[in-house]
Amino acid sequence: MTVEVHVVTEPTDEIIAAFGRLLPQLSRSAPPLDREALDRMLRHDANTVFVARMDGEIVGTLTLVMVPIPSGLRARIEDVVVDAGARGSGVGSALTLAAMRVAESANARTLDLTSRPERDSAGRLYERLGFRERDSRVYRLES
C-alpha cells in the first residue's frame, strides 16, 4: 500500500476525528483536541502538522516545530504517532522524511527528536534515516 503524506492546514471534522483516534495511542494523558485547540496548533507559525494516509484513511501524524533562536533555526519532530494497525508499513518513515525535507528546505541547522527507550522499532527507524543518539540530558518541568 502507498503512504501519502500531506500538510494539514484546516481543522476539518476528519482531522479532528483522526487526532481523537491517534493521540491516545501516543499518550494516555494527552487531552483530546477540539476544533479550537487544533486550529490554534495549525495556525502557529512554528508548526507544520503532517498526516499520513493509506487507502484514503489517516493512519499517522507528526508535528514539525521550527524556531529561530540566536544560534540559528532549530527544528524538532514532536508527537509522532502511527495507528497500531499501520505500524511496520512505512508510515513513520514517510512522515519523518516529509518533516526532514521541510526542515532542510527551511535551512534548519539541526533536527532533533526524542523517542522513549522502549520504542525499539522507532529508534531503529530514526537511525536508518540518519539520526544519531546524542549524549544529552532532557529535563522537563511539569506544569
Predicted ranges, named:
Residues V51, E57-M66, R76, V81:
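Conserved beta-strand in the GNAT
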Residues E10-R40:
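Conserved GNAT-fold acetyl-CoA-binding loop/helix
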Residues M1-D13:
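Conserved N-terminal entry element of GNAT/NAT acetyltransferase domains
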Residues S93, R109, P117-D135, R140-L141:
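Conserved active-site alpha-helix within GNAT-family acetyltransferase domains
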Residues V67-I77, R87, R134:
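A conserved beta-turn-beta hairpin within the catalytic core of GNAT-like acetyltransferases
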Residues V82, G88-R101, R124-R128:
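Conserved acetyl-CoA-binding loop-helix of GNAT-fold acetyltransferases
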Residues T96, A103-S115:
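Conserved GNAT acetyl-CoA-binding A-motif
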Residues R40-V51, R76:
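A short helix-loop-beta-strand connector motif used in the catalytic cores of GNAT acetyltransferases and
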